[in-house]
């Protein structure tokens, strides 16, 4: 939004003829403009891997349905933002690509298929950790295969077990905003 340069969004970057160059240009321009006004953290990139029809809360925000491509483009954004003095925030851990509900309003349950966590959801976040991302934002979704009934934001199994221990992340963890009435599953 003005006075900043507007970009078409991650979905357009991911579908472009030169996604790597566009991701780098987006992050470089964003870092320069944020720095000019004294900002030092961007709540980006979105590292959710699209899994079927993208719902409104993710429309235009995901780099696509290929975990490796999301990881590569996310890494470019992280590297370029942070080289420009802006802390990057990888979000929404451990991934929102399989939900049709807006987790800002209602807590969705994300039912992952066997092996999907490792081969899809964690691929971009593992790359972000390897890239040295400054912060990770958690999602409010519930992942029954990891911690039944507990939103990721409040889950020791997700935050400590998955993010800290399994991925080896030791940086800042922040939560996403939540507008709903209750933080329990199904509410």
Give the role of each language-model region:
Residues 2-5, 40-60, 87, 91-107, ...:
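Active-site-proximal loop/short-helix segments
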Residues 68-187:
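Second-shell residues forming the walls of enzyme active-site clefts
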Residues 3, 20, 36-38:
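Acidic/His-rich segments in extracytoplasmic proteins that coordinate ligands and/or metal ions
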Residues 56-70:
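Active-site cleft segment of glycoside hydrolase catalytic domains centered on the general acid/base Glu
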Residues 2-18, 62-64:
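A charged helix-plus-loop insertion that forms the helical arch/lid used to bind
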